[in-house]
Amino acid sequence: MVLPKHMRLKGHRCFDFIYKEGSRFYSSSMVLRVTDANKKPQVKGKQSKTRPSIKCAISISNKVSKKSVTRNKLRRLFHHHLSLRLSNMSCDKEIWAFISLKPSSMKNSYSTLLKECDKLLTKAGITK
Protein backbone atom coordinates (compact mmCIF):
# COMPACT_ATOMS: atom_id res chain seq x y z
CA MET A 1 0.00 0.00 0.00
CA VAL A 2 1.20 3.47 -0.85
CA LEU A 3 0.89 6.51 1.37
CA PRO A 4 -1.92 8.84 0.30
CA LYS A 5 -0.67 11.71 -1.83
CA HIS A 6 -1.37 14.36 0.82
CA MET A 7 0.81 12.43 3.32
CA ARG A 8 3.86 12.01 1.09
CA LEU A 9 7.01 13.99 1.69
CA LYS A 10 8.81 14.71 -1.54
CA GLY A 11 11.43 16.99 -3.02
CA HIS A 12 15.08 17.27 -2.11
CA ARG A 13 14.59 20.64 -0.38
CA CYS A 14 12.25 19.01 2.13
CA PHE A 15 14.78 16.30 2.93
CA ASP A 16 17.62 18.84 3.18
CA PHE A 17 15.51 20.89 5.58
CA ILE A 18 14.72 17.85 7.75
CA TYR A 19 18.39 16.86 7.93
CA LYS A 20 19.48 20.40 8.87
CA GLU A 21 16.68 21.50 11.19
CA GLY A 22 14.95 18.34 12.36
CA SER A 23 15.04 16.64 15.74
CA ARG A 24 16.34 13.08 15.83
CA PHE A 25 14.91 10.19 17.78
CA TYR A 26 16.80 6.90 17.86
CA SER A 27 15.91 3.29 18.47
CA SER A 28 17.92 0.13 17.96
CA SER A 29 16.77 -0.35 14.38
CA MET A 30 15.66 3.05 13.04
CA VAL A 31 16.06 6.81 13.22
CA LEU A 32 13.13 9.22 13.13
CA ARG A 33 13.75 12.80 12.05
CA VAL A 34 10.93 15.25 12.73
CA THR A 35 10.57 18.94 12.08
CA ASP A 36 7.88 21.59 12.14
CA ALA A 37 7.28 22.48 8.50
CA ASN A 38 6.07 25.96 9.46
CA LYS A 39 9.70 26.89 10.21
CA LYS A 40 10.76 26.27 6.62
CA PRO A 41 11.76 29.26 4.52
CA GLN A 42 8.81 30.41 2.45
CA VAL A 43 9.16 30.08 -1.30
CA LYS A 44 8.10 33.28 -3.02
CA GLY A 45 4.65 32.96 -4.53
CA LYS A 46 3.92 29.53 -3.05
CA GLN A 47 1.58 29.59 -0.09
CA SER A 48 0.15 26.41 1.32
CA LYS A 49 -3.64 26.66 1.51
CA THR A 50 -4.18 23.14 2.76
CA ARG A 51 -4.96 22.22 6.32
CA PRO A 52 -2.03 21.32 8.59
CA SER A 53 -1.07 17.69 8.32
CA ILE A 54 1.66 15.14 8.80
CA LYS A 55 3.85 14.27 5.84
CA CYS A 56 6.28 11.39 6.03
CA ALA A 57 8.83 9.39 4.08
CA ILE A 58 10.72 6.16 4.64
CA SER A 59 14.25 5.28 3.60
CA ILE A 60 15.44 1.68 3.38
CA SER A 61 18.95 1.36 1.97
CA ASN A 62 20.76 -1.53 0.32
CA LYS A 63 22.56 -2.11 3.62
CA VAL A 64 19.30 -3.24 5.20
CA SER A 65 18.75 -5.93 2.57
CA LYS A 66 20.35 -6.57 -0.78
CA LYS A 67 17.08 -7.94 -2.12
CA SER A 68 14.75 -5.29 -3.50
CA VAL A 69 11.78 -7.56 -2.81
CA THR A 70 12.52 -7.43 0.92
CA ARG A 71 13.10 -3.66 0.92
CA ASN A 72 9.85 -3.06 -0.96
CA LYS A 73 7.94 -5.32 1.41
CA LEU A 74 9.28 -3.33 4.38
CA ARG A 75 8.45 -0.05 2.67
CA ARG A 76 4.88 -1.16 1.93
CA LEU A 77 4.50 -2.43 5.49
CA PHE A 78 5.61 0.90 6.95
CA HIS A 79 3.48 2.91 4.51
CA HIS A 80 0.39 0.91 5.45
CA HIS A 81 1.15 1.22 9.16
CA LEU A 82 1.76 4.97 8.96
CA SER A 83 -1.32 5.62 6.85
CA LEU A 84 -3.49 3.82 9.42
CA ARG A 85 -1.87 5.52 12.41
CA LEU A 86 -1.65 9.06 11.05
CA SER A 87 -4.62 9.41 8.69
CA ASN A 88 -7.24 10.28 11.29
CA MET A 89 -4.99 12.49 13.41
CA SER A 90 -5.62 16.19 13.63
CA CYS A 91 -2.77 18.53 14.36
CA ASP A 92 -2.44 22.28 14.67
CA LYS A 93 0.77 22.51 12.64
CA GLU A 94 2.31 20.81 9.65
CA ILE A 95 4.82 18.14 10.66
CA TRP A 96 7.39 16.43 8.45
CA ALA A 97 8.70 13.03 9.53
CA PHE A 98 11.44 10.93 7.95
CA ILE A 99 12.18 7.34 9.02
CA SER A 100 15.50 5.69 8.16
CA LEU A 101 15.99 2.02 8.88
CA LYS A 102 19.39 0.96 10.19
CA PRO A 103 21.23 -2.02 8.66
CA SER A 104 20.70 -4.01 11.86
CA SER A 105 16.90 -3.75 11.52
CA MET A 106 16.58 -7.04 9.62
CA LYS A 107 17.48 -8.94 12.79
CA ASN A 108 14.07 -7.99 14.18
CA SER A 109 10.65 -9.26 13.16
CA TYR A 110 8.22 -7.01 11.30
CA SER A 111 5.98 -6.64 14.34
CA THR A 112 8.96 -5.53 16.45
CA LEU A 113 9.87 -2.92 13.85
CA LEU A 114 6.33 -1.54 13.83
CA LYS A 115 6.29 -1.37 17.64
CA GLU A 116 9.58 0.54 17.58
CA CYS A 117 8.11 2.90 15.01
CA ASP A 118 5.12 3.54 17.30
CA LYS A 119 7.44 4.19 20.24
CA LEU A 120 9.45 6.71 18.22
CA LEU A 121 6.31 8.48 17.01
CA THR A 122 5.12 8.73 20.61
CA LYS A 123 8.54 9.89 21.79
CA ALA A 124 8.52 12.60 19.11
CA GLY A 125 5.06 13.75 20.23
CA ILE A 126 3.33 12.93 16.95
CA THR A 127 1.05 10.24 18.37
CA LYS A 128 -0.18 9.53 21.86
UniProtKB/Swiss-Prot annotation:
Q: GO:BP terms for this protein?
A: tRNA 5'-leader removal
Q: Name one GO molecular function term.
A: tRNA binding
Q: Which SUPFAM superfamilies match?
A: Ribosomal protein S5 domain 2-like
- What is an example of a Pfam family matching this protein? Ribonuclease_P
Q: Which reaction does it catalyse?
A: Endonucleolytic cleavage of RNA, removing 5'-extranucleotides from tRNA precursor
Keyword annotations of the record: Endonuclease, Hydrolase, Nuclease, RNA-binding, tRNA processing
Q: What is its EC number?
A: 3.1.26.5
List GO terms (cellular component aspect).
ribonuclease P complex
TM region positions: none
> What subunit structure does UniProt give?
Consists of a catalytic RNA component (M1 or rnpB) and a protein subunit.
Family named by the database record: Belongs to the RnpA family.
Alphabetized PANTHER family for the sequence:
RIBONUCLEASE P PROTEIN COMPONENT
What this chain does, per the entry, is described as: RNaseP catalyzes the removal of the 5'-leader sequence from pre-tRNA to produce the mature 5'-terminus. It can also cleave other RNA substrates such as 4.5S RNA. The protein component plays an auxiliary but essential role in vivo by binding to the 5'-leader sequence and broadening the substrate specificity of the ribozyme.
The protein in question is named Ribonuclease P protein component
Record the organism. Prochlorococcus marinus (strain NATL1A)
Traced from the root, the source organism's taxonomic lineage reads: Bacteria, Bacillati, Cyanobacteriota, Cyanophyceae, Synechococcales
